[in-house]
Amino acid sequence: MKKKILHHTSIMIIFAVLVTFLAASVVTYSKLNTYMQRGVREEAQYICLAMDEYGDSFLTKKLRTVSSSRVTLIRKDGTVLYDSEASPKKLANHSDRPEFIQAEKNGKSESIRYSETFAKKTFYYAVKLDDGNVLRVGKTVDSIYSTWISSLAVLGLLMLLVLIPVSYTHLTLPTI
């Protein structure tokens, strides 16, 4: 009888831990994604201010040392003038990118889509500059699945910490 109760209790504990872990992962992913997007928008605004002050010369290779985001300057016709991650000469015309098209129309835009350069889902924020060019800042977005997988080791350790004492107690208790 005690074995059966302990077995059911262990299953309930494992189930509760898994449900809590999944719920916490979803909430954490959502919050981190929101903070990342806000950070990209703010970074784009800071770069715009610096470009107003220093011109396009602000966009140098040194920008990579202070920013983990991908920064791209795109001419009105879609030609890439600067990219912090790839040579502009190797990049295709960006006039068909959704964030570029919307920034041209509305002054600013954002999109989440697959990036050929990063080979990952990427959040882009684009701003139309006074000279007609478009500044685009992008950051890769981990999927909730990859976030969950990377946390599985921690979950496994926590489950061991819970199950070992329960199992030890069960094995060392005298049976009556």
Predicted regions: what they are:
Residues S150-Y168:
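Selective recognition of signaling/oligomerization transmembrane alpha-helices
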Residues T169-T175:
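Conserved small/polar residues in nucleotide/adenosyl-binding loops
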Residues R70-T72, T122-L129, G138-T140:
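Structured catalytic cores of enzymes that bind and process phosphorylated ligands/cofactors
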Residues L49-D52, D130-L155:
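Helix-start (N-cap) segments at beta->loop->alpha junctions
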